[in-house]
Amino acid sequence: MEIFVTGIGTDVGKTVAAAVITEALQADYWKPIQSGDFDFGDADRVKSYISNSKTVFHDNVYKFHTPASPHFAAEQENITIDITQIKRPKTKNSLVIEGAGGILVPLNEQHLVVDLIAPTDLVVVVSRHYLGSINHTLL
């Protein structure tokens, strides 16, 4: 089983949701693209919440110093994100995949985060609880 965790934006709680799912399923965790927080990224945060010994943390494919959307962070570092290089890790375990930013965040001039979601993925969309959040989530 592969679960893709995305959200309605940055800092909405994707990492906490991914950690809860990872721990509950004793699944592997993978964040293919990390922007900013180079010293203590999302994988490090998830590790701090995990107590099981079964979870494997797979390396980021792209990791940027600039705390921004992947396409902008890549541009600042003179890198082009090539989604053909973003290959899912091989594992017999369930895999929790955490997206970067929201579902329609650009990765490059042609691709968005949604393009990383496989047709067979279970998708979790993390939102917030406030007046108007249903509309923001459905947009």
Language-model features and meaning:
Residues 5-6:
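Hydrophobic anchor at the beta1->P-loop junction of P-loop NTPases
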Residues 32-35, 100, 128-129:
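Short, ordered loop/turn segments at secondary-structure junctions
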Residues 16-80, 89, 93:
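N-terminal phosphate/diphosphate-binding loop that engages ATP/GTP or pyrophosphate donors
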Residues 2, 11, 20-22, 102-139:
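Conserved catalytic-core segment of NTP-binding enzymes
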Residues 29-31, 97, 124-125:
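Structural beta-sheet core signal
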Residues 82-83, 112:
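A diffuse structural propensity rather than consistent per-protein peaks
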Residues 85-108:
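Switch II (G3) loop of P-loop NTPases
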